[in-house]
A protein has these predicted regions:
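Noncatalytic modules at the cell exterior or secretory-pathway interfaces
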Residues: 103-119
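Proprotein-processing/basic-patch segments
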Residues: 116-144
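Extended low-complexity, serine/threonine- and proline-enriched intrinsically disordered segments
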Residues: 53-68, 133-135
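Extracellular carbohydrate recognition and processing domains
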Residues: 68-104
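A short beta-strand element within beta-rich, extracytoplasmic domains
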Residues: 36-47
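Short beta-strands within extracellular/lumenal beta-sheet-rich domains
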Residues: 16-32
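N-terminal leader/pro-regions and domain N-caps
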Residues: 1-18
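Short coil-to-beta strand junction motifs in C2/discoidin
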Residues: 37, 50-58, 127-130
Length: 144
C-alpha cells in the first residue's frame, strides 16, 4: 500500500468484510521465553469504515518441540475488538486476554501463529488491513 503525499509504502494483509480469512507465520521464540501464556496487539488500518464500526481479530498458536508431529491442534483462539478511528490511520488494538499456546511452547522453540478477522463478530464495512502483530511474553531470565 502507498500512503499518498509522502510516499510512505508498507505491506498489509487484507481481510475482507464477508469471508473469514486467515494468515499464518512461524516464529522462533527467544531463549528466555518462559513457556507461559502470551498476549497480542493488532496494528492495522482500513480500506473503508465509519466511526461506529469495529473489527474483531482472532489469534491462536501452537508450539513445537523436536520430533513433534506438525499436524496438531492449536491452543484456544482469543479475540479482541477494536473501533474504527479514521480512514488510513494506524489503529492499535488493546491487548488480548491471555493466549495459551497449544503443544510444547518453550524458549528457543518454534511457534506457529494463526490470525484472522472474525467477520461474524465485527461490522466494519471495508477491508481490514493488518500491518503487524505485537506479541508479549513472560521471561524466565533477563538475558539470552
Amino acid at each position: 500500500v502507498e500512503a499518498g503525499t509522502n510516499d510512505v509504502d508498507y505491506y498489509v494483509l487484507e481481510f475482507d468484510t464477508t469471508t473469514e480469512e486467515r494468515a499464518f507465520w512461524v516464529a522462533q521464540m527467544p531463549d528466555n521465553y518462559d513457556g507461559g501464556t502470551i498476549t497480542a496487539r493488532f496494528i492495522w488500518t482500513n480500506a473503508a469504515g465509519a466511526s461506529t464500526e469495529t473489527v474483531t481479530w482472532g489469534i491462536k498458536a501452537r508450539g513445537y518441540a523436536d520430533s513433534d508431529a506438525i499436524d496438531q491442534a492449536y491452543g484456544t483462539e482469543v479475540t479482541v475488538a477494536d473501533t474504527w478511528l479514521a480512514q488510513g490511520d494506524i489503529h492499535i488494538s488493546a491487548a488480548t486476554s491471555a493466549i495459551t499456546i497449544g503443544g510444547s511452547p518453550a524458549g528457543g522453540r518454534p511457534v506457529i501463529f494463526n490470525v484472522g478477522r472474525k467477520t461474524a463478530s465485527d461490522n466494519m464495512a471495508g477491508d481490514a488491513r493488518l500491518i503487524a502483530v505485537q506479541i508479549e511474553y513472560g521471561i524466565s531470565t533477563y538475558s539470552d
